[in-house]
Amino acid sequence: MILTKEAIVRDFLNMGLWRGEVLLVHSSMSSLGFFVEGGYDAVIDAFLEVLGDTGTLLFPALSYATVTREFPVFSLKGTPCCIGKLPEAFRKRPGVIRSLHPTHSVCAVGRLAKEITMNHGMDTTPVGPNSPFRRLYEFGGRILMLGCGLR
């Protein structure tokens, strides 16, 4: 079965996603099926279409497998994330902002992207008071587990 962006938009709306919300997505691209017409961009574009210009889309951009004690180098633009192809495709898109945390950064685009990602590097833990995770809570955001569990 070929999955189109239009079908994904319909499914997201049927799931209860809405225009203007703040949404953090954990994902497994393979859970969407054998073939998505348009690939990663179609899925990301479907999210952006549903959330609209007043929404904010976030993906974790964890790099704990790349930034290690043996190689303690982190680059906002260059360090890849290690948790999937969809978050990595999102990270590389124009206009996406990445929080400044060497191992647990978050990428965001949309109305609140800057507010959610700023000052993450000032925390002593990945989920401190300046973290995108805390700000997600403060802005009433939700987390979508797209084809993946809690492990």
Predicted regions and their residues:
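N-terminal/domain-start segments enriched in small and hydrophobic, helix-friendly residues
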Residues: 8-24, 29-32, 102, 140-145
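N- or domain-start disorder-to-order transition segments that initiate the globular core
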Residues: 1-7
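Secondary-structure boundary elements
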Residues: 14-21, 49-56, 92-97, 136-142
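Short, glycine/acidic-rich beta->alpha junctions
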Residues: 4, 38-40, 124-128
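Short alpha-helical segments and helix-capping/turn motifs at coil-helix boundaries
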Residues: 8-10, 43-44, 128-132
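Amphipathic alpha-helical segments in well-structured domains
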Residues: 5, 40-44, 83
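N-terminal active-site beta-alpha-beta segment that forms phosphate/nucleotide-binding
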Residues: 16-71
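Internal, conserved structured core segments that host functional sites
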Residues: 67-151
